[in-house]
Amino acid sequence: MVKCDAFRRLSLGKKENIQMVTHILTTFNRTLAHEDFGKLLLRLAVGGLMLFHGVHKLIDGVEGIAGMLTAQGLPAFIAYGVLVGEVLAPCLIILGIATRPAALVLAFTMIVAWLMVGTGKTWLLDNTGAWAIENLMYFFVGALAVACLGAGRYALGQAQWR
């Protein structure tokens, strides 16, 4: 019985409970309200993950892509556009230099990739039950988000770090 009475004495009233919860939520929101850091994380994720795809093509050469393009009746030199979309644009996105145009280039690259290899898979699931073109969509939507939001404060392309 003593423990319950002690607990009752320590417990706050309804008004104090509401104030305490409001204070906790306000502190939590202030702690996480870093839009520029969120933009940096988005840039690092979208640009960094796409860069893995681009570096692979850079190391192996563009011959494989050029072969796919010529098989579809397109000129092989377009394969170098893949390097722009999967190496140069992600580097610019990561660094925050010309971020919006670079993100639009990346989004366009994903549309071209979908037209080249994904149109037949648009309404299919893969063997794990995931959408067959979900990676393309992640990069496409992520690039559009970067294009809409911009680089934010933590970017080399800013005149100054406000």
Locations of the language-model features?
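Extended, low-polarity transmembrane helix blocks
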Residues: 2-7, 11-56, 76-84, 88-162
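Membrane-interface interhelical connector segments
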Residues: 59-73
